[in-house]
From Swiss-Prot:
It catalyses: reduced [plastocyanin] + hnu + oxidized [2Fe-2S]-[ferredoxin] = oxidized [plastocyanin] + reduced [2Fe-2S]-[ferredoxin]. This is Photosystem I iron-sulfur center. It comes from Prochlorococcus marinus (strain MIT 9303). GO terms for biological process: photosynthetic electron transport in photosystem I. It is an enzyme of class 1 (oxidoreductase). Pfam families: Fer4_7. The cyanobacterial PSI reaction center is composed of one copy each of PsaA,B,C,D,E,F,I,J,K,L,M and X, and forms trimeric complexes. It is a peripheral membrane protein. HAMAP family: PSI_PsaC (MF_01303).
Amino acid sequence: MSHAVKIYDTCIGCTQCVRACPLDVLEMVPWDGHKSGQIAASPRTEDCVGCKRCETACPTDFLSIRVYLGDETTRSMGLAY
């Protein structure tokens, strides 16, 4: 299944998505521009199975991490014309 994962700038650096991932494809990276000092990095999508547990774990009102499956990938990420 073709899918993509996007980390939005609303990430609060809480690590909930990283801990929720059963395949350990997400990681936090240092980022000086954020009050937590870290932010979720783009995952290894070749290992991601699209379970969306990271989305479910995200505590922000606007999901900071989104998994786009199949056709919604290009539309939802604003890549379709």
